[in-house]
Amino acid sequence: MVYNMDFLIAAMVILLLILWDFLGQKRADDLNNQIFLFFAVLGILDVAAELLSNYYISSGGGDFGLAAMLTTTVFYLFQALLPFTLICYIVTLHDNKMISAKKMLLPALPTFFLIGLVLLNPFTEKLFYFDLTEGYVEGSWYKLMYYSAIGHMAAAFILIILWSRRMGYRKTMVLLEILVISGSGVVIQFLDHSLLMTGFGLSLGILALFITINNPNVNTDSLTGVYNHLYLTR
């Protein structure tokens, strides 16, 4: 299969620019911004791993066997972590001081299970494996990665609706838009694996967060550069 990596390259450019701008500006040092920063960095690592994985897979050379297995496994690990990170981000908008470990235990269990499957995959070959003649081959449990992403997005949707009054109309609408954008990327790639849209949808979602909820300029006065009342009411 020939993969179209144009969207992945665009996603990498978008995410790097977001990270550069976010780190270069004065910002509120709260839990939500910390999770956003982690989310953005994880997104960059995810896209980078997918680019390398698809490069080695597409090369088809026997010398790239180990590199293809390693980069693809790392990419799958990031894919397992990203949906849970989105849940954590939403929770910080509800509990902006501290995340309860007990509250996060239940949504973390599917993620831990999926990470275990990814780490054991070189031995079980349930998610993917490499064949000398066919190259990259999807395993019998391959679609579990997509089901996990969709399931976490469904859980995120429920949390957003339940906590909409606490978070406010603006944040609620932004989060719902992000679910639509990111979810569309997952669905498109699920229907056509050659279109690598998951990373692109992720980058657009993080961009939407950056220019709205996590915009550093929102919390500072344009003349003095000090925090304004919006920072104090976060």
PLM feature spans:
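Extracellular-loop-to-transmembrane junctions of the mid-late helices
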Residues: V2-A10, L117-A155, Q189-L195
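Hydrophobic alpha-helical transmembrane segments of multi-pass membrane proteins
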Residues: D6-L86, P107-E125, L175-F190
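Alpha-helical transmembrane segments in multipass membrane proteins, preferentially the mid-helix core
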Residues: L17-F22, T85-Y89, Y146-M167
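Membrane-interface helix-boundary motifs at transmembrane edges
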Residues: F22-F36, V91-M104, I161-T172
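Non-cytosolic membrane-interface motifs at loop->transmembrane helix junctions
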Residues: D63-T73, D131-Y142, T198-L202
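Alpha-helical transmembrane segments of integral membrane proteins
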Residues: Y89, A101-T111, D131-E138, I150-L162, ...
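Interfacial "cap-and-anchor" motif at the non-cytosolic start of specific transmembrane alpha-helices
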Residues: L162-N217
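Conserved nucleotide-binding and Mg2+-coordinating catalytic segments in signaling enzymes
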Residues: N214-R234
